[in-house]
Amino acid sequence: MKYLSIASILLFTAYAQAKSLTVYTSRKEHLVKDIFKTYEKETGVKINYKTGKAGALIQNIKAELKDPKVDIFMTVDAGNLWYASSEGLLESTKSDVLTSHVPAHLRDRDNRWFGLSVRARTTVVNTNLVKKGTNISYEELAKPEWKGKLCLRTSKKVYNQSLVAMLIGTHGYDKAKSIVKGWVANKVDIFSNDTNVLKAVAAGQCAVGIVNTYYFGRLIKKQPKLPLAIMWPNQKSYGVHINVSGAGIVKNSKHQEDARKFLEWLASDEAQKQFAQVNMEYPILKTAPQTDIVKSWGEFKPNTAFNLTDAGKLQKKAIKLMHEVGYK
């Protein structure tokens, strides 16, 4: 009988481990499973994944950090990514592929996380109530002429917290507070999600709402005759606020090199095409195709001056500000 040496056993174990990666993701399973399967087919590397709420997954990673069971954390919104990195849970990753494919304002300044798909937090109007060509901006929506015309999603959602963080980063705390206070004064109602905001706008309950683009895409795909249209805000100033879904390598991951290769693949043309198609988001790569629905919205000026790392850094101030003005 032949016996394997300890060195051979360790080498075999390391090789076996490299044949799989584990991802914790707050993205819905139907949005990522086919992307993971494509990678498995192309590389032979099995992608195991666990889904859940971003906060709960971050706590799981924190609890396991000395002996992590996960290699990659994937979630929505730079605020969640920043929180994970600020807790020391993500590794700084050196990769020419990632830094060349992911624009600087859509990744962590220390390369601990990278945006993988883009969504804009835009204004959507009822076309029967708002004239085409109306100048809309986040700041304009705080003015008296929009009183009783604005629908908002709850301030408890990270998407709005990051939007307000952007306003703080752009204008300073006091001016941002004045803007959000104006929103609250002008609001018709506060809704639990973006879809309900859109339905209220379509019904004429309000003239305008602030939502993520893919929610609009999903609804208009099902009901194309709704009197709704995207009206890109801030096109005469700094541009519409954009955010990301993204990912980073977990600190102490046992498969750092393989995890980096997977992240690089997620920023490739093939994966970017799938990201764009599955949820009507904008690909990070300009060479990756958009869906026909997304193309139909036309070009817009995005806010590229605001680094999304600051959306996380300013999140606590944003939450405090919204509480102070009564934005629930």
Map each language-model feature to its residues:
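Early extracytoplasmic/lumenal segment of secretory-pathway proteins
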Residues: 18-82, 328
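Sec/Tat signal peptide C-region and signal peptidase I cleavage site
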Residues: 12-18
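A ligand-binding cleft/hinge motif common to bilobed small-molecule-binding domains
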Residues: 79-83, 202, 207-227
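Sec-dependent N-terminal signal peptides
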Residues: 3-12
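Mature extracytoplasmic/periplasmic domains
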Residues: 245-305
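Extracytoplasmic ligand-binding site segments that recognize negatively charged/polar headgroups
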Residues: 26, 30-33, 69-205, 238
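Extracellular/periplasmic bilobal clamshell ligand-binding domains
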Residues: 292-328
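A beta-strand-loop signature enriched in Asp, Gly, Thr, and Trp
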Residues: 214-248
